[in-house]
């Protein structure tokens, strides 16, 4: 079965082909340079860029893969959560393919696709505890199978990735700034007393990183010399060493985020939801962060769990994960009608699949 996947939930336009669970080819266009001019994603610009790019990328994908459009057996598309205008562009294109070639349409939960992405590189193990950590979401799931996810904890305000971007903005670093903060932190020494582990003094599995962001802001107001000049910030973004104090602050911030994530994961593993768990899956853009990878690896080893983390290219938004998730859903005979609706961030995605014969096209 050959499934095409379409990802347009935010500012990356990604398309990919997965045949029988293996990646055939993928193409991607990022809008990061455009939105960097505004310090963050501008929804109207994002949707217009998706509209401009999606057709040419589709043609490029098929041409480079040596695949004809009539060979497609299914079309999978990110239905949410995400920016509504961006999602609608991908949804409209996917529906056109489904209608034009009379193939099944599969709406994919963008967050679930992130957690399944590593299946393109290795065998997934279930039941698993899943941590989805990205710019818009920081969620913990218990995952029984590729089609069975139960949300245990979620972002209440600022997600981890959003905190990275806002701290980078405070330091005059370009969007997206997470990679730069990770890089500079590696050259510094963390002070565990500098920043709090936010929203951990409770017994739940939810996250709130607004307090950490405020703590960084307060620290910078007391130490304005840590904020680089525009020219110095540009040099830091280019890979030059920041001053020692700033490198140490970056290290402390990275440690605070990673430890907070692991505190909540450990709590989940200690509770009823951790019974029988065999693996820890970590995914999303922030899963590429070296501190998050190291801390979750130590947690997995201490609990005797397999750690499953996709390679960095599969951590960011991409069409490959949508195509793979769509292929998995079709293996279970699941699809949607052409009435499928996009679901913006903040709304629950309904379980409204249609059941048909497994693996059919």
From Swiss-Prot:
Binds 1 Fe(2+) ion per subunit. The keyword Repeat does not apply. Fe cation binds at residues 110, 114, 317. Substrate binds at residues 132-136, 165, 178, 182, 289. InterPro entries: ATPase_NBD, Gcp-like_dom, KAE1/TsaD, Peptidase_M22_CS, TsaD. GO terms for biological process: tRNA threonylcarbamoyladenosine modification. It holds the Pfam family TsaD. Its EC number is 2.3.1.234. It catalyses: L-threonylcarbamoyladenylate + adenosine(37) in tRNA = N(6)-L-threonylcarbamoyladenosine(37) in tRNA + AMP + H(+). It comes from the Bacteria. Its cofactor is Fe(2+). One of its GO terms (molecular function) is N(6)-L-threonylcarbamoyladenine synthase activity. GO terms for cellular component: cytoplasm. Keywords: Acyltransferase, Cytoplasm, Iron, Metal-binding, Transferase, tRNA processing. Required for the formation of a threonylcarbamoyl group on adenosine at position 37 (t(6)A37) in tRNAs that read codons beginning with adenine. Is involved in the transfer of the threonylcarbamoyl moiety of threonylcarbamoyl-AMP (TC-AMP) to the N6 group of A37, together with TsaE and TsaB. TsaD likely plays a direct catalytic role in this reaction. Belongs to the KAE1 / TsaD family. This is tRNA N6-adenosine threonylcarbamoyltransferase. The gene is tsaD.
